[in-house]
């Protein structure tokens, strides 16, 4: 009972996190990884159920933390028995400083009650390194995003009536604003996010994610300016970036943050069938880095 109480508090707390999803999924579940040491790590899965009960989607670990990581998940779900299993593989992006071979991938088996209001998913997991060694064990406990939204609505109704809470705080606590903050990759000043791709040429779209107010940015590749003084507007601007064989560190610098104090530029990167969306939230003179890591296409042995 205690563990469930702490998990509920934790679920509410992880909604102070940034988000936006452009792709729709059959299921979107939020909660935590509970390690055997009783340590909690925020966790999210979103997936579609395909033919033959096959599931495919993404996981997001340590949301808005220093090790935030997005990975593919693949597995199976039987809605008649409620049994579900999936494994993480192939990192899409990470904020972690660990090397790819040092990542601990989740292998999960448990129950998923998709017909219930909570959309409760829970069960055991084993964390596995690339070399198949075990790196962690514990449980995963998740509930549906819509269930949490209902809970937040109830809390918001109470807060809205409290006169001592200012309007800005009330606005940020609106359910639609809370939930809008949950799944996007947001980089702040001095932060670096590593994105893993298989291509040598990367298409990128750039636009103003907030209010159009005259934001101007410059992008440097390995400290050399490649796109200078771009005026960011609500209209998407498309560019193609040629990647070097080894290092591809792209620095986004806010030259002018416009009328508002903070520049919120959204960048969408395309790599074959993959897409990555990153929001750079930077004040004038601040910079953040997107590190593009080129991967080799795996060959069959």
Residue ranges and their predicted role:
Residues 129-132, 255-264, 272-276:
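Short acidic/polar inter-strand loop motif in beta-rich domains
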Residues 23-27, 123, 198-200, 244-248, ...:
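A glycine-anchored, Pro-Gly-centered beta-turn/N-cap motif
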Residues 61-116:
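Contiguous, well-ordered beta-strand patches that form the walls/edges
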Residues 214-224, 261-272:
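Short, surface-exposed beta-strand/strand-loop-strand elements in extracellular ectodomains
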């Amino acid at each position: 009972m205690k563990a469930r109480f702490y998990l509920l508090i934790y679920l509410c707390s992880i909604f102070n996190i940034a988000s936006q999803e452009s792709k729709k999924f059959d299921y979107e579940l939020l909660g935590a990884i509970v390690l055997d040491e009783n340590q909690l790590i925020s966790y999210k899965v979103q997936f579609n159920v395909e033919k033959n009960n096959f599931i495919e989607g993404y996981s997001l670990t340590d949301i808005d933390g220093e090790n935030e990581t997005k990975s593919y998940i693949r597995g199976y779900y039987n809605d008649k028995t409620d049994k579900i299993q999936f494994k993480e593989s192939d990192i899409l992006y990470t904020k972690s400083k660990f090397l790819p071979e040092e990542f601990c991938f989740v292998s999960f088996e448990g129950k998923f009650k998709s017909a219930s209001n909570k959309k409760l998913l829970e069960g055991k997991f084993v964390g596995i390194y690339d070399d198949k060694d075990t790196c962690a064990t514990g449980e995963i406990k998740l509930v549906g995003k819509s269930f949490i939204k209902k809970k937040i609505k109830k809390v918001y109704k109470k807060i809205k009536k409290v006169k001592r809470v200012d309007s800005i705080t009330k606005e940020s606590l609106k359910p639609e604003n809370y939930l809008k903050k949950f799944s996007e990759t947001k980089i702040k000043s001095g932060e670096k996010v590593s994105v893993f791709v298989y291509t040598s040429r990367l298409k990128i779209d750039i636009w103003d994610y907030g209010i159009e107010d005259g934001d101007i940015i410059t992008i440097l590749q390995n400290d050399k300016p490649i796109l200078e003084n771009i005026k960011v507007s609500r209209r998407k601007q498309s560019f193609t970036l040629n990647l070097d064989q080894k290092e591809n560190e792209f620095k986004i610098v806010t030259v002018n943050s416009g009328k508002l104090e903070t520049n919120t530029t959204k960048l969408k990167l395309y790599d074959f069938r993959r897409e990555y969306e990153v929001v750079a939230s930077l004040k004038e003179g601040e910079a953040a880095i997107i590190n593009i890591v080129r991967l080799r296409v795996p060959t069959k042995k």
